[in-house]
Amino acid sequence: MLRTTASRKIVLRRGLASINTGTTVASKKASHKFRNTFWTIALSATAFYAGGIIYSQKNDKFGDFFSNNVPFAEDLLETYEHYHDRPTLFLEDSWDGLKAKSNDLLSGLTGSSQTRRSNRENIEVKKILSLEPLNIETENSDPQLKEIIGSLNDLINSLNDSNLSIPESEFNSIKKSNQNMLTNLSQLNETLKEALSNYMIQRTSEVITELNTQYENSKREFEKNLQKNLLQEVDEFKENLTKQKDKELEEKLKANEELLQAKHANGVGLLSITQVKEFNKIIKDKIEKERNGRLAHLEEINSEVNDLSKSIDRSSKILSKNEALVQLTFQVDEIKSRINNNNLPDVNIDKELSRLKLLSNLLSTFNKKSCCDDGDCCSCKKGNKNEGKEGKISCKCKPKTNPPSLLSVALDELESTCSGKKILSNEQIYNRWNLLADDFKTASLLPPNSGILGQLTAKVFSLFLFTKTGNPSNATDFDSVYARVGDNLRVSNLNDAVEEVVSLKGWPHKVCESWIEDARRKLEVQRLVEILDCEIRTL
């Protein structure tokens, strides 16, 4: 802190006086510093006690600690509670005290003015204030006490640094007060340590008791909840187990019922077979007995047996035809699923075609017409003029040649289209079209009769072209055609895409020839498979 010129002169004069006589002349400024220091200490103590009293009213534990360990704290708390509980008494005492203080103040003002005048005239012997700091072990003390001791040491150091000159009597009293304060603070520190230790022990026991109580309560609640959850889980498990067992029992009963029905059906079938055998045996015995006498009846039986065999043959043909149609439908559906599956890059349907060919030949044998227009062969008719002596009829009808069916024609076309060749999926066709982008751009720049130089030039300039995407307008330039084809392939519109590519001419058409062949093969196979499906459904 910088000092003025006047203060420097006073300090110099004070130093010279102390050197010569050992005493210093008290100045008005030195007494003013001491008064400020005194008021600072008083205000700090007042604030400390006031804060402790106010916080003690809010926290009972701190109030006990404050009244037991801080000097004069208990009396101040009792006084505060006395006037706080009886506010009218406080007003009466405050009024009486105010009147007494006003009288004392008036008398003090007159006396103080006289004493000040006498002090100015008299020169007292004073000493430089030098206080010892508070050396108290605060390693395990309360943090607030540490803060108080630190603040007091800072205050003592500031007083020592200010070089205050005070009278000898006041110097001795201050030294004594410092020693008393050191003793009281040491006692307070020990008391605080002991109280803190007792408080920690008591609080620890309370916390342990509280924790034990909470543990017991939580334990009982947990056991209750656990028991409730276990009972609920047992009920749910019991219910689920009951449902599962009922379901298993129902399934077993159903299986046993089906088994009994199957056994019953087998028994009925076996019984019918046995009855037929017995019937045949009886018929055979009767025929053997009456063979010689009843040939007419034997011929009637023979004709009925022939009719029965024809009916059986027709039934077997119908069943075989239906089975052949079912197998044809299954094979056609298999081919359709394979050619429409995008997970397969290419498909070979030679095996399916051979099966279709075999089933078609089998079906054509069932669809053969008789040699006569009425559906029956003349050899099967009775009373015919061509009947011989042995009862046999020679058929003179010319065999009819049936025209090839649509099914066989479609199969032949499908075999010629796909024999030894693979059918690409829509995704594979789209990918191959994307691979033609660079060659397509190069071909779009080539003249009709281009040489090697034209090829190289078109290849170089094609690197600077951009490929169009999306669905542009119906323009005829190569980029628009390429974009429309890509968009049609993206939505699996292969027919329109092939029409766009086929309409190209010159080098672009030549570049796309292999792609056109694969796409046309895919379209032809799809159309032929659709024709086969429709024809089989009509049969």
UniProtKB/Swiss-Prot annotation:
Mitochondrial intermembrane side: 57-539
Topology, Mitochondrial matrix side: 17-36
Any one GO cellular component localisation term in the record: MICOS complex
Gene Ontology biological-process entries: cristae formation
Swiss-Prot/TrEMBL keywords: Coiled coil, Membrane, Mitochondrion, Mitochondrion inner membrane, Transit peptide, Transmembrane, Transmembrane helix
Transit peptide location: 1-16
Key word Transit peptide present: yes
Keyword DNA-binding tagged: no
InterPro entries recorded: MIC60
Coiled coil: 172-264
Subcellular location, record wording: Mitochondrion inner membrane
Segments crossing the lipid bilayer: 37-56
Topological type in the membrane: Single-pass membrane protein
Family affiliation: Belongs to the MICOS complex subunit Mic60 family.
Function: Component of the MICOS complex, a large protein complex of the mitochondrial inner membrane that plays crucial roles in the maintenance of crista junctions, inner membrane architecture, and formation of contact sites to the outer membrane. Plays a role in keeping cristae membranes connected to the inner boundary membrane. Also promotes protein import via the mitochondrial intermembrane space assembly (MIA) pathway.
Subunit structure: Component of the mitochondrial contact site and cristae organizing system (MICOS) complex.
PANTHER family reported in the protein's UniProt record: MICOS COMPLEX SUBUNIT MIC60, MITOFILIN
Protein name per UniProt: MICOS complex subunit MIC60
Gene symbol of the encoding locus: MIC60
